[in-house]
């Protein structure tokens, strides 16, 4: 898995550093934070407008983040991540949407060992933003 996000624009680097700090402040037993999707691949869209069937629509990529915990109820972690969202958007210059997925490390490693495509693609294309060093991915 990659660890560098030097290909990202400065605003994204700053946003991600802020988001990681907020997650670590609020989510106990956070073991890993992984950026995946278009920002990890470098195919993100900052803003695009299209006319679809006569309706003007806009689109922008979001930050897709997998938050990996140990010994935590994933529903409770989901609620804690909602507070990260709230805090992040209180700053008016933070405009890129965040999409969180959270999983327990045991479930994630089980999914990886079973070859589940979604998780293996994250492992191949993702960027490790934070790693506690307590666990390894299968």
Each model region followed by its residue ranges:
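Catalytic cores of NTP-dependent nucleotidyl/adenyl transfer enzymes across multiple folds
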Residues: 123-138
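Conserved beta-strand termini and adjacent loop/short-helix elements that scaffold enzyme active sites
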Residues: 36, 101-105, 132
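Short gly/ser-rich loop at a beta-strand->alpha-helix junction or flexible surface loop bordering the NTP-binding
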Residues: 31-45, 49-52
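A conserved SF2-helicase RecA2
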Residues: 117-123
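Solvent-exposed, flexible loop/coil residues
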Residues: 43, 112, 116, 133-134
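Metal-dependent nucleotidyltransferase catalytic core
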Residues: 2-27, 53-113
